[in-house]
Amino acid sequence: MEKVKLGIVGGSGIYEIDGVQDGNWISVDTPFGAPSDEIFTGSLNGIDVAFLPRHGRGHVHTPSNVPYRANICALKSIGVTEIVALSACGSLREDMKPGEFVIVDQFVDRTFQRSKTFFDQGCVAHVSVADPVCHRLGDMCRQVMDDLGLTYHHKGTYVTMEGPQFSTRAESILYKDVWNCDVIGMTNMPEAKLAREAEICYASIAMVTDFDCWHEDHDS
């Protein structure tokens, strides 16, 4: 099977990538079941890439039902060593406005219905996730943002809620004012933890789509 290096995990609304040469969709089986979709492989600007839509084409997987273990295992099995994960998020800060990006450097995991580790059923290991992202890959993402002239924030803490419902106003204020989180979403956990267990370099780019409900303009 063709070996690739850079994995791109697409979030809500991102089901394909442009500019890929010699692209084709491939099926990958894993011990954890099927991934969210087939994986699109090819070459982008001379780099071997593998693209996986996190929710599947047509957005068929809820955040709770995304097969996170199968996704990471499938990417690992075809040679991916680095993942750039894209996700839509809500802002918990006045200065992180809709249309801007955040290079996430920390997470708070509030999920409770998802399989979060590869190490169970007789295979036990304890992996540090104190620094859950790859700073080298994050720096490369920042350089690309600079080159493209995009408005972005160099770092931020992403709180992952279970979903599919959004947070209550009390929860939103808790995350913002007590826990000092910056953005909120539903999908980067346990994805980042699993990538660390699989020894894959992981970077997260959060795309701010709106203010969370702490903000008076959250519905606008």
Regions found by a protein language model. Give the residues of each.
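Generic non-transmembrane alpha-helical segments
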Residues: 136, 140-151
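Active-site glycine- and acidic-residue-rich loops that bind
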Residues: 130-135, 165-166, 177-187
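Active-site phosphate/oxyanion-binding loops
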Residues: 94-124, 151-174, 197-220
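Metabolite-binding pocket within alpha/beta catalytic cores that recognizes anionic/polar moieties
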Residues: 1-130
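Short acidic/polar active-site loop segments enriched in Thr and Asp
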Residues: 81-82, 182, 201
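Non-catalytic positions within long, well-ordered alpha-helices that form the structural scaffold/packing
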Residues: 76-79, 176-177, 196
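Generic hydrophobic/aromatic pocket-lining and core-packing "Φ" positions
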Residues: 72, 172, 189-192
